[in-house]
Amino acid sequence: MAGRIVIFGATGYTGALTARALVGQGVRPVLAGRNANALAALAAELGGLETAYADADYPWTVRSLVERDDVLVTTVGPFRRYGHAALAAAVDAGAHYLDTAGESLFVREVFDEYGVKASSVLLPAFGYHHVPGNLAGALALDRVGEDAARIDVGYFLGGGSLVRGLSGGTFESAPGLLATRMYTYRDGVVDEPRSQVRDFAMAGRTRTGVSIGGSEHFTLPASHPGLREVNVYLGWFGAASRIAARLPRGRAAAAAIGFCGRGLARMARRRAGKGTLTSRIVAAAYDAQGGLLTEIHLSGGDPYDFTAGIVAWGARQVADGMTETGALGPVAAFGLSELEAACAMAGISRVTG
């Protein structure tokens, strides 16, 4: 391999899953974080891996983790609060970068600000948010070609308790999904002051999603310039989605999360064992008159297991050598068929709607 793979946030829930996935794929990553005892315990469990101290509150410690051609994987969130240290470190070092961010405004920063000055490849939102939506959208567009003018992507969970299924870190980051300033794509990425809501039919049910910003708004039009409109929806909040749509963005976040039950974040931090969540992703392509051209449905298991598997795979591919630079989506970085196979390996694959 050309460079080392470093996991920043290795002792967090997603970080530890990612470390185990990499070891399972034959890689010995460097484990980085601020809790020396937890790092030592995880390193010993995984066969004596190298560890390194780094704390996002002290950016120079994060910068010391990587040099040119290394691969920095960061799972440290909320990313709007803690993510910039790793992102800036990778860009400054010329190291490749993958994150598991789902926070829209942070994803936008990577594409709008950091991507243009990077001499390495930056792969933001490289987890359950937003790799499957990129895959489903690209598969739909590949099927219908230039006839597509609009694409709608929806992310949905099922199969178990949302509280037991989601980690504390996800609940801390959840307000960033419905942030005060959101964006969409209408012949370019533009601000969206209020949430939009739409229903998706899947597996004999109607599921409601509320609009969010994602990497799809940047990546799908880049590879399909005929697109005029890209929408991404999150189906976590059920009936609260329609309440959120009537409120300004900041209040929408509080309403949707509050509606799901008081103390969710506190309960999630006490999360014992694994939940039983399943994943469902849909992409629907439309022509310029609003006619449905095709739908692609993906289905799989636990989103955290998927994130760990796909991040581990992506980090390995990048470490083996990348000539591309700047902020990219997963299809542009690796190719459509390769990405579909990798997602299936990680636990999410194509199904009949």
Predicted regions and their residues:
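C-terminal helical cap and adjacent loop that interface with cofactors, partners, or active-site loops
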Residues: 272-353
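Rossmann-fold NAD(P) dinucleotide-binding segment
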Residues: 64-68, 80-99
